[in-house]
């Protein structure tokens, strides 16, 4: 779905007011439709996508660092890397496994898929802290990075929800709110044996890194589809 491109309104003051309000609002559903129709919609979407793209890149990079840090600390001989990982809890037929498939999806569908993927990592910090607190070595370094990742996931989710709310102003049939399932911790971290537990954590960080790459790709695709040539 592409929004029709409209020439920007001459009143820069109105747009600046809209942007400043956007930063304070928990929900942008109160943005007046008339503002959406004068070109401000495209500008606000572009503004949010700029922030979201930067966060998603950081999320992707930090997830990769966390996986590498964990393997360096707890799998120095790379035994885990030579084994198939556990099936990722976000694996689903509805989630495209490459960029080409994602590009063929309708933007509103891909947007929902991306939000669902992020929601599936909602309890990441809780599970990591509970399962790494008693490990030898320096788990606090990894936990500190997971705390940053947790904040990035929350920011990404909020931004994508705001984008969805704005799009619902243009397309009233688009659902504004949906229930997105959280993650129970299975299958990675509910293990008692240390070696199995470590492999489960390796699989967790592997899946997180894989999803972070997908989220970054999906956001890039959504930006090109929804605010092209901005």
Swiss-Prot record:
Q: What is this protein called?
A: Prolactin-5A1
Superkingdom of origin organism: Eukaryota
User: What GO molecular function terms would the record report?
Assistant: hormone activity
Entry's Pfam families? Hormone_1 (PF00103)
The secretion signal range is 1-30
Q: Which parts of the chain span the membrane according to its record?
A: none
InterPro entries found in the cross-reference section: 4_helix_cytokine-like_core (IPR009079), Somatotropin/Prolactin (IPR001400)
**Composition skew (Polar residues), residue ranges:** 80-97
Q: Which organism is it from?
A: Mus musculus (Mouse)
Has UniProt tagged this entry with the keyword Signal? Answer: yes
């Amino acid at each position: 779905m592409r929004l029709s491109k409209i020439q920007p309104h001459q009143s820069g003051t109105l747009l600046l007011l809209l942007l400043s309000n956007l930063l304070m609002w928990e929900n942008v559903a109160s943005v007046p439709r008339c503002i959406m129709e004068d070109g401000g919609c495209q500008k606000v979407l572009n503004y949010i996508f700029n922030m979201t793209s930067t966060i998603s890149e950081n999320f992707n990079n930090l997830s990769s660092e966390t996986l590498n840090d964990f393997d360096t600390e707890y799998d120095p001989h790379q035994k885990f890397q030579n084994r198939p990982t556990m099936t990722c809890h976000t694996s689903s037929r509805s989630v495209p496994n490459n960029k080409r498939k994602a590009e063929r999806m309708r933007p509103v569908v891909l947007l929902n898929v991306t939000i669902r993927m992020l929601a599936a990592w909602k309890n990441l910090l809780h599970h990591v802290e509970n399962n790494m607190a008693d490990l030898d070595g320096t788990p606090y370094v990894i936990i500190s990075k997971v705390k940053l990742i947790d904040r990035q996931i929350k920011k990404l989710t909020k931004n994508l929800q705001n984008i969805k709310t704005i799009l619902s102003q243009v397309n009233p049939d688009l659902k504004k709110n949906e229930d997105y399932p959280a993650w129970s911790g299975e299958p990675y971290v509910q293990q008692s044996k240390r070696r199995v537990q470590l492999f489960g954590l390796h699989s967790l960080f592997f899946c997180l890194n894989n999803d972070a790459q997908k989220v970054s790709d999906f956001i890039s695709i959504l930006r090109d589809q929804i605010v092209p040539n901005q």
